[in-house]
């Protein structure tokens, strides 16, 4: 046994070094779609559009060849905007795939027949043409009504909501209203930012995850607010943030919730490359749970995250 110990130690050291050298998926503002047994990850990263990655187990990922130009899922030649393609989310609606994304600090939507694209706009224009907005996300309630949440540039970045028409692209402008703004001490590091939200409904309560502080800050983190209606009013948890600087990670945020093949609720988010470098931001996944508390249930994010690794 004593002779085996040095060998075991050597093998363990080799395994640790190998794990540290595995490359992580370089996606910021990530979103995961599960469709037909395959996970599709979209995010900020490509300069001329939106790339897509695929996985069958959420652990190892491959850069997929998208059907748009240059192997992307969405290319700038098919949509409004020339640059700054950020924060895409993809949903299957009406037998098509809808991608909600930001281009040149304007919120847009494009459609495709495949999760690999090409995502195209028949009419090349943003959803709100006369105002800069970012980070649009879709929520469809149990009654079929669709809502879009997004960030507006007023007194920093604040999160707003608007109901959509049945086509999930046209705004009912009279329903537009604010949801949350910078209000808690942990959010006031720099600058004034509440952004990158995502909304789900559970047992009649609406849960909104969001990120606060600049994405460049090591104190970027994820908070939660709840409401009894998708239009609010929203109340932030008094014990926010739910996730900030877990383990060795810094700059964690811009998350999205999804369910895996077993139906478990998970959250995907990005973190900085390292404590000394922001870019490229990298994708991580962890579990989401609900704990019974006085007056209801509280969302919790497991700090035991897993990196999304590139299959070699």
Residue ranges and their predicted role:
Residues 2-10:
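Sec-dependent signal peptide recognition
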